[in-house]
Curated annotation (Swiss-Prot):
Descriptive protein name: RNA exonuclease 5
SMART domains found in the cross-reference section: EXOIII, RRM
SUPFAM superfamilies: Ribonuclease H-like, RNA-binding domain, RBD
EC number: 3.1.-.-
RRM domain sequence ranges: 505-579, 600-679
Biological classification of the source: Eukaryota, Metazoa, Chordata, Craniata, Vertebrata
Domain Exonuclease: residue ranges: 228-376
Keyword field: Exonuclease, Hydrolase, Nuclease, Repeat, RNA-binding
Pfam families: RNase_T, RRM_1
MF annotations from Gene Ontology: exonuclease activity; RNA binding
Basic and acidic residues bias spans: 1-10
GO annotation, cellular component aspect: nucleus
Alphabetized InterPro entries for the sequence: Exonuclease_RNaseT/DNA_pol3 (IPR013520), Nucleotide-bd_a/b_plait_sf (IPR012677), RBD_domain_sf (IPR035979), REX1-like_exo (IPR034922), REXO1/3/4-like (IPR047021), RNaseH-like_sf (IPR012337), RNaseH_sf (IPR036397), RRM_dom (IPR000504)
UniProt feature, compositional bias: Basic residues: 11-21
Length: 772
C-alpha cells in the first residue's frame, strides 16, 4: 500500500481582526493599519496566505522569530502566540510545512549568483535576511533547548490504556459525532461530497491536471444498497514521479476480483519495496500497462459502484482515473484537528486484525483492500456512536507515547512555556517531524524525540527521498549541504558585490557643450534620486557627467528619462559604465524588476515629510496599499526624499504610479528594482570606491579554472542546478503547503556571512514555475 499521509487539514476557525501591524525599514518603514484590517477581513479568502509585507527591523528575522512562525503553523493562535514579524492568515487551512535548508550558502551566495537562482526567486514573494548561524542552526530554528537533549528524556511508560479513559469521553466533542451525529447513517451519508473531494485533492473532471485522466463511467443512481469495492494500489518512484505497480480490488464478501501487477511507462528510480513489496525481480516479467488495468477496471465496476480506499485520492491519481462515488476511511473515521488514523491502527483497534507486519516485505495490497472494505462496513453496521465510544484518539495517543518512549505530559503546560520547541508542538497533536539530511550533517535534531530521521549519502539521494517522503509527513525539514566559500573567495565576493552595485547605480551622461549650465544639469540629474557623488569627466573631447546614485532605481530612471534627449542642441547618451561586472546589467535589471518580491512595489523620489499623511487623505486613489516604506538617513535619522510603496497587486501599483507621477503630485518614480531586504543590506555595507576606468577585477585562478571547465561542483553551476531541482520539488508540493528555503549563512574565525530566507505558500492556482 502507498505510504500513508497524516494530513493536517483542519476545520476553519473564525479569524479576529488585527489592530495594528507595525512595519520598519531601518527603523523608518511604516505599515498602513487600514489596509491590513481590510486584508484580514476579506470574507472570500478561504486559503492560507501570508501578509504582503514582513514587519522586521532591517528586514532581518532572528532564529527565534523563525521558530515562532513554525510553531504557529503547527498549532494556530489558540495554543501559541502569533509570530511577531509576519501575518499568517487562515493557518487552519495549511496542509503541510516544508523547510529546505541549503547548508553552506548565504545571502552573499544568493546575490552573487542571482541570475542562476531564477527558479527560487521567482517562486517566492517573501525574502528576508538571517543572522549568521550558531553551531547548530537547525536546533535554533526548531527551538531545541539544552535541557531537551536525548540523554535527559523521561523513561518509557509501559502498560495498557488507563482504565479511566472511557469514563472521560465526552461524546458530543468527538469529531465523528460532530460530523455524523449519534444515529446510524446510510452509505450515501458516508460518500465524500464534490466539495470535500476538491478539498482533499481527489482527481475531478474539468481540472487542468486531470485532462488525461479516464472516467470510470459509473454514473448510475446511488442508494444505501449500492455495491462497495475496496481498492488499494502500490506505487513506485519513476523519473516522472509516482506510477502504479499493483492494483487490488475486493468486492463485498471479501472476494478479490482484480489483482494485477503493472509495468510503469517511465524509468524506475525506486521500487519503494519497504512499502509496496514490489521488487525489480517481481516486476521484470510483467507486461501489463496502465491502460490495460484502466480498461479492466471500467469493465468490472457497475454503474452505481462505490470505491472505498484509505487516502484514496493517491490511488486514483496513480490510476489516472476519475470516479464520482468514493468513501475514504482515513476521512470517514474523523480524527481531531484534521489528522488521520493510519490503516494499520484502525485494523487493530476496530477489527482486531494485524496487518503490515514488520516481518513481511512491504504491504499486501489485497489484504489492505479487504481491511479497508471491512472498516467501511463496520462503520455502516454499528454507527458513529459505537466508534466514538472506542475513544480512538486516546488509544492512538497512548500508542504514540509508548512508541516515543516517554511519559504522558501536561500538553497545556508545555505549550504555554516560552521555550516550547516545534517538536513538542507536533508531539502535542500526535504528529512527527521528518528530517532528511546527509549522514555527515545530521546534528542534534537527528537524535531528537519525535523526529523521523533519514540519513543519505549525497544531496542527490536527499532529493530523491524528499520526493517520496514529504507527502507523508505534516512537517518536513530537508537539508542539503554545499561547500562554503573559502575566506579568500568570500572576501573577493564581498568586494565584487559592493563594486558591482556601485557601478550599476552609476551613469555617465554626455557629451555636453563647454558652455552648458552646470547647475541646471546637476538639478536635473538629482531629480531622479539621492546622489552619492557627481563629477565632471574632462578626459573626453567634450565634457561628460558621472553620477553615482544611492539606489539602483534612480540610475535606471535617469537612463530611461534622459538617454537620447537634446541638451543645448546636442543629443546626449546616458549609460552605465561598461565593465566585466556590468556586462549583464540589462539582464540583471530586467530580472530584478520581475522578482516576485518586487511585484506590486514602486519607487518614488521627491517625497516630503508629510507624504504619508497626504496618502492617507486619499485612500480611494490608492486601493490595495499595504505599506509605506520611508528610509531614514543612517547618520542623522532624518527622512530621505525617496520611498517605496508596497501594493497587493501589480495593477494597483501601476495605477498609483500613474497618479503619483502625474501633474498633481509631480513625483518621479518607477517600479521597484531592489528587494526590500537587499536594499537594507546594501545600505549597511561599508562603502567601496569605484574602480578607475579600465581596472579589471581578475577572479582567483582556481575560480577562473572552474568556470572554464564548468565543473558541476562550482558554486555558480551548483546554484543553477540545485535552484532548478528544488524549484521543481517545490512545484510538486500539494496546495496549501507553507514552504521556507533557508540559506543559513556561515560563521567562522575568518568572519561571518548573513543568511537569507525565502518563504511562500504553495497555492492551487499557482502556475508552474517558469523555466523548469
Amino acid at each position: 500500500m502507498e505510504p500513508e499521509r497524516e494530513g493536517t487539514e483542519r476545520h476553519p476557525r473564525k479569524v479576529r481582526k488585527r489592530r495594528q501591524a507595525p512595519n520598519k525599514l531601518v527603523g523608518a518603514a511604516e505599515a498602513m493599519k487600514a489596509s491590513w484590517d481590510l486584508e484580514e477581513s476579506q470574507p472570500e479568502a478561504k486559503k492560507a496566505r501570508l501578509s504582503t509585507i514582513l514587519f522586521t527591523d532591517n528586514c532581518e528575522v532572528t532564529h527565534d522569530q523563525l521558530c515562532e512562525l513554525l510553531k504557529y503553523a503547527v498549532l494556530g493562535k489558540s495554543n501559541v502566540p502569533k509570530p511577531s514579524w509576519c501575518q499568517l492568515f487562515h493557518q487552519n487551512h495549511l496542509n503541510n510545512v516544508v523547510v529546505f535548508v541549503l547548508q553552506g550558502m548565504s545571502q552573499l551566495h544568493f546575490y552573487r549568483f542571482y541570475l542562476e537562482f531564477g527558479c527560487l526567486r521567482k517562486a517566492f514573494r517573501h525574502k528576508f535576511r538571517l543572522p549568521p548561524p550558531s553551531s547548530d542552526f537547525l536546533a535554533d530554528i526548531v527551538g531545541l533547548q539544552t535541557k531537551q537533549r536525548v540523554g535527559d528524556l523521561p523513561k518509557t511508560m509501559e502498560g495498557p490504556l488507563p482504565s479511566n479513559a472511557k469514563a472521560t469521553i465526552n461524546l458530543q466533542n468527538d469529531p465523528i459525532i460532530q460530523k455524523y451525529g449519534c444515529k446510524k447513517v446510510g452509505l450515501t451519508r458516508c460518500l465524500l461530497t464534490k466539495e470535500e473531494m476538491r478539498t482533499f485533492h481527489f482527481p475531478l473532471q474539468g481540472f487542468p491536471e486531470c485532462e488525461n485522466f479516464l472516467l470510470t463511467k459509473c454514473n448510475g443512481s446511488i442508494a444505501d444498497n449500492s455495491p462497495l469495492f475496496g481498492l488499494d494500489c502500490e506505487m513506485c518512484l519513476t523519473s516522472k514521479g509516482r506510477e502504479l505497480t499493483r492494483i487490488s480490488l475486493v468486492a463485498e464478501g471479501g472476494c478479490c476480483v482484480m489483482d494485477e501487477l503493472v509495468k510503469p511507462e517511465n524509468k524506475i528510480l525506486d521500487y519503494l519495496t519497504s512499502f509496496s513489496g514490489i521488487t525489480k525481480k517481481i516486476l521484470n516479467p510483467v507486461t501489463t500497462k496502465l491502460k490495460d488495468v484502466q480498461r479492466q477496471l471500467k469493465a468490472l465496476l457497475p454503474p452505481d459502484a462505490v470505491l472505498v480506499g484509505h487516502s484514496l485520492d493517491l490511488d486514483l491519481r496513480a490510476l489516472k482515473m476519475i470516479h464520482p462515488y468514493v468513501i475514504d476511511t482515513s476521512l470517514l473515521y474523523v480524527r481531531e484537528q484534521g489528522r488521520r488514523f493510519k490503516l494499520k491502527f484502525l485494523a487493530k483497534a476496530i477489527l482486531g486484525k494485524d496487518i503490515q507486519c514488520p516481518d513481511r516485505l512491504g504491504h499486501d495490497a489485497t489484504e489492505d483492500a479487504r481491511i479497508i472494505l471491512e472498516l467501511a462496513q463496520y462503520f455502516l453496521k454499528y454507527g458513529p456512536k459505537k466508534i466514538a465510544e472506542l475513544n480512538l484518539e486516546a488509544l492512538a495517543n497512548h500508542q504514540e507515547i509508548q512508541a516515543a518512549g516517554q511519559e504522558p505530559r501536561n500538553t497545556t503546560e508545555i505549550l504555554q512555556h516560552p521555550n516550547t520547541s516545534v517538536l513538542e508542538c507536533l508531539d502535542s497533536v500526535g504528529q512527527k517531524l521528518l528530517f532528511l539530511t546527509r549522514e555527515t550533517d545530521a546534528g542534534e535534531l537527528a537524535s531528537s524525540r519525535n523526529c523521523q530521521t533519514i540519513k543519505c549519502l549525497s544531496n542527490k539521494e536527499v532529493l530523491e527521498q524528499a520526493r517520496v517522503e514529504i507527502p507523508l509527513f505534516p512537517f518536513s525539514i530537508v537539508q542539503f549541504s554545499f561547500k562554503a566559500f573559502s575566506p579568500i573567495l568570500t572576501e573577493e565576493m564581498n568586494k565584487r558585490m559592493r563594486i558591482k552595485w556601485t557601478e550599476i547605480s552609476t551613469v555617465y551622461a554626455g557629451p555636453f557643450s563647454k558652455n552648458c549650465n552646470l547647475r541646471a544639469l546637476k538639478r536635473l540629474f538629482k531629480s531622479f534620486g539621492p546622489v552619492q557623488s557627481m563629477t565632471f569627466v574632462l578626459e573626453t573631447r567634450q565634457p561628460h557627467l558621472c553620477i553615482q546614485y544611492e539606489v539602483l532605481e534612480a540610475a535606471q530612471l535617469a537612463i530611461e528619462s534622459l538617454d537620447g534627449i537634446l541638451v543645448d542642441g546636442t543629443c546626449i547618451k546616458v549609460q552605465r559604465p561598461v565593465t566585466e561586472l556590468t556586462l549583464d546589467c540589462e539582464t540583471l535589471v530586467n530580472e530584478l524588476e520581475g522578482d516576485s518580491e518586487n511585484q506590486g512595489s514602486i519607487y518614488l523620489f521627491g517625497v516630503s515629510e508629510t507624504f504619508k499623511e497626504q496618502l492617507l487623505q486619499e485612500p480611494r486613489l490608492f486601493l490595495g496599499l499595504g505599506a509605506v516604506i520611508l528610509p531614514k538617513d543612517l547618520k542623522n535619522g532624518k527622512q530621505k526624499k525617496y520611498c517605496f510603496l508596497k501594493f497587493k497587486s501589480f495593477g494597483s501599483a501601476q495605477r498609483a504610479l500613474n497618479i503619483l507621477t502625474g501633474k498633481d503630485w509631480k513625483l518621479k518614480g518607477r517600479h521597484a528594482l531592489t528587494p526590500r531586504h537587499l536594499h537594507a543590506w546594501l545600505r549597511g555595507l561599508p562603502p567601496e570606491s569605484r574602480r578607475p576606468a579600465g581596472l579589471r577585477v581578475v577572479p582567483p585562478p582556481f575560480e577562473q579554472e572552474a568556470l572554464q571547465t564548468l565543473k558541476l561542483d562550482h558554486p555558480k553551476i551548483a546554484a543553477w542546478r540545485w535552484g532548478r531541482k528544488i524549484g521543481k520539488l517545490y512545484n510538486s508540493l500539494c496546495p496549501g503547503t507553507l514552504c521556507l528555503i533557508l540559506l543559513p549563512g556561515t560563521k567562522s574565525t575568518h568572519g561571518s556571512l548573513s543568511g537569507l530566507g525565502l518563504m511562500g505558500i504553495k497555492e492551487e492556482e499557482e502556475s508552474t514555475i517558469s523555466g523548469l
